Swiss-Prot record:
Its main location: virion. It is an enzyme of class 3 (hydrolase). This is Dual specificity protein phosphatase OPG106. GO terms for cellular component: host cell cytoplasm; virion component. It is found in: Virion; Host cytoplasm.
Length: 171
């Protein structure tokens, strides 16, 4: 087995078939200005202690937040194993990086705050990685977020796409 195949096998094996984690209900601060949450967290964003400048909505449903100055960016994504989420990684990670640099808080969410939004957050954190071992960093981030939130990027296709872009292609 070549090195890339081995890495992919180990990463997918160590993050799959785990005990079923419960869906998160709380919003999680990922970096100084990037937050991960679910649909309810987005609906509560206008009254949040965090003064969000943006909400990145990754559900299929478009909405507005009445009486709010929050800018909503909508990228409609289906949470299934056929969705090519990787085509959005570069744009979303660049946007989240700008939010962090400009001190503009952003909430990234999908319906449950697990797969679509979790994948974008994992891609963002992987894009910031300056470590020499992307495989170890992936496992560290994945398991740290799972410890914090419970369920996190359970969709095997989304996980595979992140591994291919940020781990396999980096080696």
């Amino acid at each position: 087995m070549d090195k890339k195949s081995l890495y992919k096998y180990l990463l997918l094996r160590s993050t799959g078939d785990m005990h079923k984690a419960k869906s998160p209900t709380i919003m999680t601060r990922v970096t100084n200005n990037v937050y991960l949450g679910n649909y309810k967290n987005a609906m509560d964003a206008p009254s949040s202690e965090v003064k969000f400048k943006y909400v990145l909505n990754l559900t299929m449903d478009k909405y507005t937040l009445p009486n709010s100055n929050i800018n909503i960016i909508h990228i409609p994504l289906v949470d299934d194993t056929t969705t090519d989420i990787s085509k959005y990684f570069d744009d979303v990670t660049a946007f989240l990086s700008k939010c962090d640099q400009r001190n503009e808080p952003v909430l990234v969410h999908c319906a449950a705050g697990v797969n679509r939004s979790g994948a974008m957050i994992l891609a963002y954190l992987m894009s910031k990685n300056k470590e020499s071992s992307p495989m170890l960093y992936f496992l560290y981030v994945y398991h740290s977020m799972r410890d914090l939130r419970g369920a996190f990027v359970e969709n095997p296709s989304f996980k595979r796409q992140i591994i291919e872009k940020y781990v396999i292609d980096k080696n």
